[in-house]
Protein backbone atom coordinates (compact mmCIF):
# COMPACT_ATOMS: atom_id res chain seq x y z
CA UNK A 1 0.00 0.00 0.00
CA UNK A 2 1.26 3.43 -0.95
CA UNK A 3 -0.82 5.36 1.56
CA UNK A 4 -3.73 5.70 3.96
CA UNK A 5 -6.43 8.20 4.93
CA UNK A 6 -6.04 10.19 8.13
CA UNK A 7 -7.95 12.81 10.09
CA UNK A 8 -6.30 16.05 11.15
CA UNK A 9 -6.42 16.53 14.94
CA UNK A 10 -4.45 19.76 15.23
CA UNK A 11 -0.93 21.00 15.91
CA UNK A 12 1.40 20.83 18.90
CA UNK A 13 5.14 20.74 19.44
CA UNK A 14 7.77 18.28 20.55
CA UNK A 15 11.29 18.81 21.85
CA UNK A 16 14.26 16.87 20.54
CA UNK A 17 17.20 15.71 22.66
CA UNK A 18 18.87 19.13 22.23
CA UNK A 19 15.80 21.00 23.47
CA UNK A 20 14.86 22.34 20.03
CA UNK A 21 11.12 22.86 19.55
CA UNK A 22 9.64 20.96 16.57
CA UNK A 23 6.16 22.04 15.35
CA UNK A 24 4.16 18.91 14.48
CA UNK A 25 0.72 18.09 13.14
CA UNK A 26 -1.15 15.20 14.75
CA UNK A 27 -2.99 12.92 12.32
CA UNK A 28 -5.19 10.05 13.44
CA UNK A 29 -5.07 7.04 11.11
CA UNK A 30 -7.58 4.43 12.25
CA UNK A 31 -7.42 0.88 10.81
CA UNK A 32 -8.58 0.64 7.18
CA UNK A 33 -10.83 -2.08 5.76
CA UNK A 34 -10.41 -3.27 2.18
CA UNK A 35 -13.69 -2.89 0.26
CA UNK A 36 -12.56 -3.71 -3.29
CA UNK A 37 -9.54 -4.93 -5.23
CA UNK A 38 -9.41 -3.46 -8.74
CA UNK A 39 -7.46 -5.08 -11.57
CA UNK A 40 -6.70 -4.43 -15.23
CA UNK A 41 -8.98 -7.20 -16.52
CA UNK A 42 -12.15 -5.86 -14.87
CA UNK A 43 -11.45 -2.18 -14.21
CA UNK A 44 -8.66 -1.16 -16.59
CA UNK A 45 -6.23 -0.33 -13.79
CA UNK A 46 -4.94 -1.72 -10.50
CA UNK A 47 -5.99 -0.19 -7.19
CA UNK A 48 -6.98 -0.99 -3.62
CA UNK A 49 -10.22 0.57 -2.37
CA UNK A 50 -10.54 1.13 1.38
CA UNK A 51 -12.81 2.64 3.99
CA UNK A 52 -12.08 3.83 7.51
CA UNK A 53 -13.99 5.16 10.49
CA UNK A 54 -17.55 4.16 11.34
CA UNK A 55 -20.94 5.19 9.98
CA UNK A 56 -24.44 3.84 10.59
CA UNK A 57 -25.88 2.02 7.57
CA UNK A 58 -29.02 4.18 7.77
CA UNK A 59 -26.89 7.21 6.86
CA UNK A 60 -25.62 5.82 3.53
CA UNK A 61 -27.55 5.09 0.34
CA UNK A 62 -28.53 1.66 -0.95
CA UNK A 63 -25.73 1.22 -3.53
CA UNK A 64 -23.11 2.02 -0.87
CA UNK A 65 -24.86 -0.30 1.59
CA UNK A 66 -24.80 -3.14 -0.92
CA UNK A 67 -21.14 -2.49 -1.70
CA UNK A 68 -20.17 -2.67 1.98
CA UNK A 69 -22.24 -5.81 2.62
CA UNK A 70 -20.71 -7.49 -0.44
CA UNK A 71 -17.24 -6.65 0.90
CA UNK A 72 -18.17 -7.92 4.35
CA UNK A 73 -17.11 -4.75 6.18
CA UNK A 74 -18.78 -2.11 8.34
CA UNK A 75 -19.65 1.19 6.68
CA UNK A 76 -17.02 3.92 7.05
CA UNK A 77 -17.04 7.68 6.73
CA UNK A 78 -16.03 7.45 3.08
CA UNK A 79 -14.44 5.33 0.37
CA UNK A 80 -11.00 5.98 -1.09
CA UNK A 81 -8.68 4.11 -3.40
CA UNK A 82 -4.94 3.98 -3.94
CA UNK A 83 -3.55 3.02 -7.32
CA UNK A 84 -0.89 0.32 -7.56
CA UNK A 85 1.36 -1.03 -10.26
CA UNK A 86 0.32 -4.43 -11.54
CA UNK A 87 3.71 -5.90 -10.59
CA UNK A 88 3.65 -4.37 -7.10
CA UNK A 89 0.02 -5.18 -6.28
CA UNK A 90 -0.23 -6.00 -2.54
CA UNK A 91 -1.59 -9.42 -1.57
CA UNK A 92 -4.86 -8.32 0.01
CA UNK A 93 -8.38 -9.71 0.20
CA UNK A 94 -11.79 -8.15 0.86
CA UNK A 95 -12.19 -7.27 4.52
CA UNK A 96 -8.46 -7.23 5.30
CA UNK A 97 -7.27 -4.67 7.85
CA UNK A 98 -4.49 -2.18 7.03
CA UNK A 99 -3.01 -0.18 9.91
CA UNK A 100 -0.65 2.73 10.48
CA UNK A 101 2.12 0.14 10.77
CA UNK A 102 2.94 0.66 7.06
CA UNK A 103 4.47 4.05 7.95
CA UNK A 104 6.70 2.62 10.69
CA UNK A 105 9.92 2.84 8.64
CA UNK A 106 8.91 5.78 6.41
CA UNK A 107 10.89 9.01 6.80
CA UNK A 108 8.99 11.37 4.49
CA UNK A 109 5.38 11.59 3.33
CA UNK A 110 3.25 13.58 0.88
CA UNK A 111 -0.05 14.81 2.34
CA UNK A 112 -3.07 15.92 0.31
CA UNK A 113 -6.10 17.72 1.70
CA UNK A 114 -8.68 20.42 0.98
CA UNK A 115 -7.36 23.82 2.10
CA UNK A 116 -9.44 26.11 4.31
CA UNK A 117 -11.99 28.08 2.28
CA UNK A 118 -11.65 31.86 2.61
CA UNK A 119 -14.45 32.94 0.28
CA UNK A 120 -14.24 35.68 -2.35
CA UNK A 121 -10.94 37.55 -2.01
CA UNK A 122 -9.35 40.46 -3.84
CA UNK A 123 -6.06 40.37 -5.72
CA UNK A 124 -4.01 41.72 -2.80
CA UNK A 125 -5.02 38.90 -0.46
CA UNK A 126 -5.33 36.22 -3.14
CA UNK A 127 -2.22 36.90 -5.25
CA UNK A 128 -0.07 39.23 -3.09
CA UNK A 129 -0.53 42.19 -5.45
CA UNK A 130 1.01 45.53 -4.44
CA UNK A 131 -1.41 48.20 -3.22
CA UNK A 132 -1.76 51.40 -5.21
CA UNK A 133 -0.86 54.80 -3.72
CA UNK A 134 -2.62 55.74 -0.51
CA UNK A 135 -2.64 59.43 -1.52
CA UNK A 136 -1.03 61.54 -4.31
CA UNK A 137 -4.38 62.03 -5.98
CA UNK A 138 -5.50 58.43 -5.78
CA UNK A 139 -9.02 57.77 -4.56
CA UNK A 140 -11.25 54.69 -4.67
CA UNK A 141 -8.48 52.59 -6.26
CA UNK A 142 -6.23 51.75 -3.32
CA UNK A 143 -6.86 47.99 -3.56
CA UNK A 144 -7.86 47.82 -7.23
CA UNK A 145 -5.95 45.31 -9.42
CA UNK A 146 -5.15 47.77 -12.23
CA UNK A 147 -5.20 47.01 -15.95
CA UNK A 148 -6.19 43.48 -17.00
CA UNK A 149 -5.42 43.73 -20.72
CA UNK A 150 -3.83 45.68 -23.58
CA UNK A 151 -5.67 47.31 -26.50
CA UNK A 152 -7.71 46.45 -29.58
CA UNK A 153 -5.09 43.77 -30.09
CA UNK A 154 -5.50 41.17 -28.63
CA UNK A 155 -8.87 42.60 -27.60
CA UNK A 156 -9.44 40.04 -24.87
CA UNK A 157 -8.31 39.06 -21.38
CA UNK A 158 -5.80 36.21 -21.41
CA UNK A 159 -6.80 32.96 -19.73
CA UNK A 160 -5.26 32.52 -16.30
CA UNK A 161 -5.11 36.26 -15.60
CA UNK A 162 -4.73 36.80 -11.86
CA UNK A 163 -7.92 38.46 -10.66
CA UNK A 164 -10.23 38.48 -7.64
CA UNK A 165 -12.13 35.28 -6.92
CA UNK A 166 -12.47 32.20 -4.73
CA UNK A 167 -9.59 31.76 -2.28
CA UNK A 168 -8.99 28.46 -0.57
CA UNK A 169 -11.08 25.28 -0.69
CA UNK A 170 -8.59 23.80 -3.17
CA UNK A 171 -7.03 20.37 -3.26
CA UNK A 172 -3.48 20.95 -1.99
CA UNK A 173 -0.52 18.59 -1.68
CA UNK A 174 2.42 19.26 0.64
CA UNK A 175 5.45 17.18 -0.29
CA UNK A 176 8.35 15.70 1.67
CA UNK A 177 7.08 16.26 5.21
CA UNK A 178 9.30 14.64 7.84
CA UNK A 179 7.72 11.86 9.91
CA UNK A 180 8.52 12.67 13.54
CA UNK A 181 6.77 9.75 15.23
CA UNK A 182 4.42 6.84 14.50
CA UNK A 183 2.36 5.75 17.51
CA UNK A 184 0.86 2.37 16.64
CA UNK A 185 -1.08 2.05 19.91
CA UNK A 186 -2.84 5.41 19.58
CA UNK A 187 -3.02 5.31 15.75
CA UNK A 188 -1.25 8.68 15.59
CA UNK A 189 1.13 9.98 12.93
CA UNK A 190 3.15 13.07 13.82
CA UNK A 191 4.62 15.03 10.92
CA UNK A 192 6.80 18.13 11.02
CA UNK A 193 5.06 21.31 9.89
CA UNK A 194 1.55 22.20 8.78
CA UNK A 195 -0.82 20.31 6.51
CA UNK A 196 -3.82 21.57 4.49
CA UNK A 197 -7.35 21.70 5.82
CA UNK A 198 -9.35 22.15 8.98
CA UNK A 199 -9.33 20.08 12.15
CA UNK A 200 -11.31 16.92 11.47
CA UNK A 201 -10.64 17.08 7.73
CA UNK A 202 -9.65 14.00 5.76
CA UNK A 203 -6.05 13.76 4.56
CA UNK A 204 -4.48 11.41 2.03
CA UNK A 205 -1.04 10.37 3.31
CA UNK A 206 1.35 8.67 0.90
CA UNK A 207 5.01 7.77 0.94
CA UNK A 208 7.03 10.54 -0.72
CA UNK A 209 7.73 10.03 -4.41
CA UNK A 210 10.41 12.72 -4.76
CA UNK A 211 13.88 12.49 -3.22
CA UNK A 212 15.54 15.55 -1.74
CA UNK A 213 18.77 15.96 -3.74
CA UNK A 214 20.75 17.39 -0.81
CA UNK A 215 19.83 14.49 1.45
CA UNK A 216 20.66 12.03 -1.32
CA UNK A 217 24.13 13.56 -1.68
Curated annotation (Swiss-Prot):
GO terms for cellular component: cytosolic large ribosomal subunit. Keywords: Methylation, Ribonucleoprotein, Ribosomal protein, RNA-binding, rRNA-binding. InterPro entries: Ribosomal_uL3, Ribosomal_uL3_bac/org-type, Ribosomal_uL3_CS, Transl_B-barrel_sf. Pfam families: Ribosomal_L3 (PF00297). GO terms for biological process: translation. The modification N5-methylglutamine is found at residue 152. Methylated by PrmB. One of its GO terms (molecular function) is rRNA binding. The keyword Heme does not apply. It comes from the Bacteria. Belongs to the universal ribosomal protein uL3 family. Part of the 50S ribosomal subunit. Forms a cluster with proteins L14 and L19. NCBIfam families: L3_bact (TIGR03625). One of the primary rRNA binding proteins, it binds directly near the 3'-end of the 23S rRNA, where it nucleates assembly of the 50S subunit. This is Large ribosomal subunit protein uL3. It comes from Blochmanniella pennsylvanica (strain BPEN).
Amino acid sequence: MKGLIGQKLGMTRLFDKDGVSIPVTMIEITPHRVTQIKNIENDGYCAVQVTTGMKNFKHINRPETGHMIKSGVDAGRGVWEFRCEEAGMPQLSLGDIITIQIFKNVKKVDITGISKGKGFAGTIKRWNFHMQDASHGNSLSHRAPGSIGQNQTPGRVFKGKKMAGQLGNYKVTVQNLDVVNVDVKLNLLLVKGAVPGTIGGNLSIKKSVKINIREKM
